[in-house]
Curated annotation (Swiss-Prot):
Its main location: virion. Belongs to the influenza viruses hemagglutinin family. Keywords: Clathrin- and caveolin-independent endocytosis of virus by host, Clathrin-mediated endocytosis of virus by host, Disulfide bond, Fusion of virus membrane with host endosomal membrane, Fusion of virus membrane with host membrane, Glycoprotein, Hemagglutinin, Host cell membrane, Host membrane, Host-virus interaction, Lipoprotein, Membrane, Palmitate, Transmembrane, Transmembrane helix, Viral attachment to host cell, Viral envelope protein, Viral penetration into host cytoplasm, Virion, Virus endocytosis by host, Virus entry into host cell. The keyword Protein biosynthesis does not apply. Homotrimer of disulfide-linked HA1-HA2. SUPFAM superfamilies: Influenza hemagglutinin (stalk), Viral protein domain. Palmitoylated. One of its GO terms (biological process) is viral budding from plasma membrane. Glycans are attached at N8, N22, N38, N63, N126, N165, N483. Residues 1-514 are extracellular. One of its GO terms (cellular component) is host cell plasma membrane. Disulfide bonds join C14-C466, C52-C277, C64-C76, C97-C139, C281-C305, C473-C477. This is Hemagglutinin.
Amino acid sequence: QKLPGNDNSTATPCLGHHAVPNGTLVETITNDQIEVTNATELVQSSSTGRICDSPHRILDGKNCTLIDALLGDPHCDGFQNEKWDLFIERSKAFSNCYPYDVPDYASLRSLVASSGTLEFINEGFNWTGVTQSGGSYACKRGSVNSFFSRLNWLYESEYKYPALNVTMPNNGKFDKLYIWGVHHPSTEKEQTNLYVRASGRVTVSTKRSQQTVIPNIGSRPWVRGLSSRISIYWTIVKPGDILLINSTGNLIAPRGYFKIRTGKSSIMRSDAPIGTCSSECITPNGSIPNDKPFQNVNKITYGACPRYVKQNTLKLATGMRNVPEKQTRGIFGAIAGFIENGWEGMVDGWYGFRHQNSEGTGQAADLKSTQAAIDQINGKLNRLIEKTNEKFHQIEKEFSEVEGRIQDLEKYVEDTKIDLWSYNAELLVALENQHTIDLTDSEMNKLFEKTRKQLRENAEDMGNGCFKIYHKCDNACIGSIRNGTYDHDVYRDEALNNRFQIKGVELKSGYKDWILWISFAISCFLLCVVLLGFIMWACQKGNIRCNICI
């Protein structure tokens, strides 16, 4: 099928843009759904199912919690002096030593996790007059009664327990973490058998802080054959400060200190297996790629991760508005140009020319306008990732039961943050999509205006994205229009001559219209004459009377 108005002395170039049979729906500011030729998914909704061991240093806790590894539970001896970027705690982890509690468990866990090391230095505390290294059948090391390897259980010696007063200065250039405890016997008899006195007292001080604990004697639920307990406490000694320990009984003494480091190490609860792979972002579900700006796999993350949002999908337009080609129009689709619809099968570019002249038909992409649009779109995804990817870890929030209101408040704050980010993400993507569509439409209009200014009066805008050229324009001529080297003056005289000839033909072929207009006028005149004659006849017969008043 020929392009409109074509003969051997004219040519018809059309401008159009790429189209696909089935586009992708995206959201913009002005439209909930608009079809584009191509779009990229922005939400990562699945994990690999395993935690990658690179580039982060992963330490698998296996059967041990971090605190058990810190204290030196016998079945966690393999973790002594270990280091990590991320410590993985498993749901199967259990304690297998003397039953204990940590009043500020979450803070201690977080402090040690962020330090990223269990490096321990023994120190020579002088515990005179008491027996050291007490053990229990509830804490076996092999077949021998034992205790936490990082703690020293002190009890009576020859039925004596003198008051203890020990100091340990920090002459280093780093913070020291001391772990100590207080033993709570289940009965008064157990208290006196171990510590002689009916009630002991433990006070641990530095220049900045002081903690005093009085044992709480009484039976508790049985755990591993014991109804007594140990409470674990911790003290940080700054460089130049001094650790002072006073006790009259019930002291579980430190054997040394842990080095505290500042860093971005963390801890995560997960049962995902650890695999040999590489991923910057880790969630409890497993590692996820970070090549998208958003994810809805898990709120808890570690590493450089996409921002968590509620949406399952957000699509970023990376192509132009899609107007599928009308199949009823033959090989040239819309015979017209971009104003009516797009062109399918244009694989070399987003914008281009189709033409028909005396040499036949052809098609070519306009690479300059295509590249201009692509350059502006290509950076969008990277900019979104830079704006949204978290370069820090979002750790779990833990609170004790007495801090339930704080936990509720924390949950509310986190949920509000997620709601805000989910809304911001949707708005941000809609804005970017609107800009992309406006941008690609603008490039099409620029190309059309550039062509129109080249042709000037040598061609006529057909109103559908095509031009009717009033001079013979071979393929070389069409090529000059495409590449911007068309010389209007060369073809001006021929174009004007052909334009007048074609208009003359159109004028002659318009005689039928004149005849129709004349016939219509005569018919109206005859109708008026008949109507006037009827009125005069009726007046003569007296059927109609006319009164003229002046």
